[in-house]
Amino acid sequence: MSFTSDVKKELTSNLATTGALLALVRMNGSVGIFNGLTLSITTENAGTAKYIYQMLRELYDVHAEIRVHQKTTLSKNRVYTVFITEGASELLDELSLADSLMLDNGVPEFVKNDEFIKKDYLRGAFLSAGSLHNPEKGEYQLSIASVYQEHAEDLQEIFRDFGLNARVIERKNRWILYLSKAEEIMDFLTLIGAMKARLKFEEAKIMREMRGLANRQSNFENANIAKSVMAAQEAINAIKFLNERKELEQLPENLKEIARVRLENPEATIKELGELLEPSLGKSGVNHRLRKLVEQANELRKIEN
């Protein structure tokens, strides 16, 4: 089951509300004429279809029929249509959609002016055409598709009322409202009553951040190891060069001692080299002496060239 499906499953376990039903009718509903006015509400999610059916019964005592058919002959996706014949006209009147469903493309004004209905409307909008990327796999993105630009921009206005900076873009003859910041997505999930999904999203976000931190730490450590290996090899090459030129014996005793210890322990760390000296020496002291050897070798190479 996808992350989007998990969210929608959680949302359909919530109480029936007029605002959620209103959004589903507004976004997925269509009217027809068959022995009177009919209303069809279409979805590809079986749980959402049952939720619509339940809300119609509980809120308006409207009896509907759920019809199932394949999306296309080649598609495995099923389409669920909640079909209403008796009471369709009265229901649209109750929802204040009798005229606006066919004439108005935006979110009804009374929804935008009611704090509680707005939240429920957002829940219905996500059930209708919402999608959420799995936070464990890729980028953070929550989106809601609208057929009409006006509706998408009205949703954007509602999002902003709740402090969510949503954007709207056109894609494949649809208007897509989306959030791409993890914190705002979590706030939206809380707003529409999907607390389990919010916690799961947050857990995935934390795990991704921890893995990212571990990878960066590993890269940093690997870079340091590579740097240390290169420095050790440079010092060993310098010592061998000085030894071949009979220059090593001319150097001060402290440099001869570190040269001997370095050659005898090519894989030792700087700290370990310091502990092998008598008396022992700190890392900065060891590095200083090794740099002196490298400088001596470089100066001799310049003279020879």
From Swiss-Prot:
<dbReference type="GO" id="GO:0003677">
    <property type="term" value="F:DNA binding"/>
</dbReference>
<dbReference type="InterPro" id="IPR018478">
    <property type="entry name" value="Sporu_reg_WhiA_N_dom"/>
</dbReference>
<dbReference type="InterPro" id="IPR039518">
    <property type="entry name" value="WhiA_LAGLIDADG_dom"/>
</dbReference>
<feature type="DNA-binding region" description="H-T-H motif">
    <location>
        <begin position="269"/>
        <end position="302"/>
    </location>
</feature>
<dbReference type="GO" id="GO:0051301">
    <property type="term" value="P:cell division"/>
</dbReference>
<protein>
    <recommendedName>
        <fullName>Probable cell division protein WhiA</fullName>
    </recommendedName>
</protein>
<dbReference type="Pfam" id="PF02650">
    <property type="entry name" value="HTH_WhiA"/>
</dbReference>
<dbReference type="Pfam" id="PF10298">
    <property type="entry name" value="WhiA_N"/>
</dbReference>
<comment type="similarity">
    <text>Belongs to the WhiA family.</text>
</comment>
<dbReference type="InterPro" id="IPR027434">
    <property type="entry name" value="Homing_endonucl"/>
</dbReference>
<dbReference type="InterPro" id="IPR003802">
    <property type="entry name" value="Sporulation_regulator_WhiA"/>
</dbReference>
<comment type="function">
    <text>Involved in cell division and chromosome segregation.</text>
</comment>
<dbReference type="Pfam" id="PF14527">
    <property type="entry name" value="LAGLIDADG_WhiA"/>
</dbReference>
<dbReference type="InterPro" id="IPR004042">
    <property type="entry name" value="Intein_endonuc_central"/>
</dbReference>
<keyword id="KW-0238">DNA-binding</keyword>
<dbReference type="InterPro" id="IPR023054">
    <property type="entry name" value="Sporulation_regulator_WhiA_C"/>
</dbReference>
<keyword id="KW-0132">Cell division</keyword>
<keyword id="KW-0131">Cell cycle</keyword>
<dbReference type="GO" id="GO:0004519">
    <property type="term" value="F:endonuclease activity"/>
</dbReference>
<dbReference type="GO" id="GO:0043937">
    <property type="term" value="P:regulation of sporulation"/>
</dbReference>
